[in-house]
Amino acid sequence: LAEGQDLRFGVTADRVEGADSARPRVFATGADGEQLEIDAEFVVGADGSHSIARTAVTGSQTGGYFREYPFAWFGILCEAPPSSDELIYSNSPNGFALISQRSDTVQRMYFQCDPDVDPEAFTEEELWEHLQARVPGTTLKEGPIFQRDVLRFRSFVAHELRHGRVALVGDAAHTVPPTGAKGMNLAVADVILLERALRALLLENDERPLDAYPETASRRIWKAQHFSWWMTSMLHVAPDATDFDRRRQVGELRSVVESEAGRRYLAEAYTGWPLETAL
């Protein structure tokens, strides 16, 4: 905006063509219905998990490594003071819960649920019962619930992150289950790596950083995929879990929280690795 560039809001991207050419094109529909055709030096697909740009890179919107999980998060927003000074991640016999804060008066909370559950199937009283049952030892501060939704769990990495003069970043390139809190962290890392590559390409005519982008980004992506899967499997109760599975899971959790090395690894991965570790 400060540079006076032509930024368009409310635009729907329809397709990307010419990834193999020197001038790829984006076809889109403007907020007023105007048909747009944009000739570009490079196209960055930062258009989310239903990416249009992904088709130009992988050949389809679904081309990638994929895993879906047998549980979801039931999320609520409520008007209440914080129940804790810190985040609460809870693994209980009743399933997982996350107690987080938005502000001094609005709180965000989640509990593990079936992916196909109807968000309107519970009364407010029942929702508080589900949440409280999953955080034994903590008394939740309740208040009016003004938003509820169900968040499905998926892991995805596109087969390719770049084709010609089109590259993917963020959720267009990968998605992770939210347990590890890695989605935004990964997206920012992608953008930093690709910005360096595009600067070298456009200002120095050096394609080597761009050629290296898929492999460089992938190393970090798969570390984050593992961490997100690990946190998810360690903290959630699988529908088919046996008594052995549950006891082993608790043993795994204790192995982490009772070990300085385990706590250090979790903290390092949760907050994000230095970008240089992916270079």
Where are these regions (language model features)?
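Active-site flanking residues adjacent to catalytic metal/cofactor-binding acidic residues
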Residues: 46, 170-171, 189
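Short FAD-binding loop at a beta-strand-to-alpha-helix junction that anchors the flavin cofactor
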Residues: 160-178
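Active-site-proximal alpha-helical segments within enzyme catalytic domains
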Residues: 191-194
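Acidic loop->beta-strand submotif enriched in PP2C/PPM serine/threonine phosphatases
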Residues: 152-158, 162
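A conserved FAD-binding loop/helix module that cradles the flavin
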Residues: 178-188
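C-terminal helical "tail/cap" subdomain of flavin- and related membrane-associated enzymes
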Residues: 181, 196-279
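Short, conserved active-site loop motifs that form the nucleotide-linked donor/cofactor pocket
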Residues: 5-6, 166
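Conserved FAD-binding catalytic core of PHBH/FMO-like flavoproteins
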Residues: 2-5, 11-14, 21-37, 42-153
